[in-house]
Each structure stands twice: as structure tokens, then as C-alpha cells.
Amino acid sequence: MKKEILEVFDNTFPGRDYTIEIVNPEFTSVCPITALPDFGTIIIRYIPDKSCVELKSLKYYFLEFRNAGIFYENITNTILDDLTSVLQPREMTVITQWKARGGITETVSVTWPQKQ
């Protein structure tokens, strides 16, 4: 995915811890095994430091996954890695909730920094 698409703007309250939650209920990708579409919800929660992610750029970043054959776990970790490298937040959690396939749903979550 092209993390260069992601744009940021200055956090005007860097001295205060507050949480930003972003939800994308229409995320799509492709199963790398079956080539069938996968549908999910992406939830991003973060405490910004010096910058915040600009939402239009995030939308276009998400569209990069639309035709990519990629596993749920890889999507979740890639989003976290890309956003933390661009934003350098104080804390971030990415949760992906996937629609049922064969009657089974999956939720994947990852947090940065990792708890010791």
C-alpha cells in the first residue's frame, strides 16, 4: 500500500491527551486464497502527538486495499505500521471486524506501542 498518500495536519492541542476515533464501515479487500471480496469495518483509535491524519487522504489510502489480495491480519498490521510511521502518535489501536464468510466472523486488533 502507498503510505505516501497519507497527509497530516498539525495537532493544535499537543499538550493534551485526547482520543480520535475513525470508523470506516465500508472497507473492502480481496481474499488472497479465493480471490473473493472481503468486507469489513476498520476502527482506528489514537492519541495524537504533533499531528493528526487528514481524512480524505485516509479514504484514498483505504482504497489502495480494494483490489489487493491480502489476509485480515496483514491488513490490520499494515494499517497500524503505516499510520504510526506517518503520525508518530502517543498511542494507537487498529481494530478490523470482518463480515461472515462461511458463517465465521473475525476481529483482529493491534495496539502500538506494545504493552510490556
Curated annotation (Swiss-Prot):
Pathway: tRNA modification; tRNA-queuosine biosynthesis. Catalyzes the NADPH-dependent reduction of 7-cyano-7-deazaguanine (preQ0) to 7-aminomethyl-7-deazaguanine (preQ1). Belongs to the GTP cyclohydrolase I family. QueF type 1 subfamily. Its main location: cytoplasm. The keyword Aminoacyl-tRNA synthetase does not apply. The keyword Cytoplasm applies. SUPFAM superfamilies: Tetrahydrobiopterin biosynthesis enzymes-like (SSF55620). It comes from Chlorobium phaeobacteroides (strain DSM 266 / SMG 266 / 2430). Keywords: Cytoplasm, NADP, Oxidoreductase, Queuosine biosynthesis. The gene is queF. This is NADPH-dependent 7-cyano-7-deazaguanine reductase. Substrate binds at V53, E54, L55, Y72, E73. The active site is at C31, D38. HAMAP family: QueF_type1. Its EC number is 1.7.1.13. GO terms for cellular component: cytoplasm. It catalyses: 7-aminomethyl-7-carbaguanine + 2 NADP(+) = 7-cyano-7-deazaguanine + 2 NADPH + 3 H(+). It holds the Pfam family QueF. One of its GO terms (biological process) is queuosine biosynthetic process. It comes from the Bacteria. One of its GO terms (molecular function) is preQ1 synthase activity. It is found in: Cytoplasm.
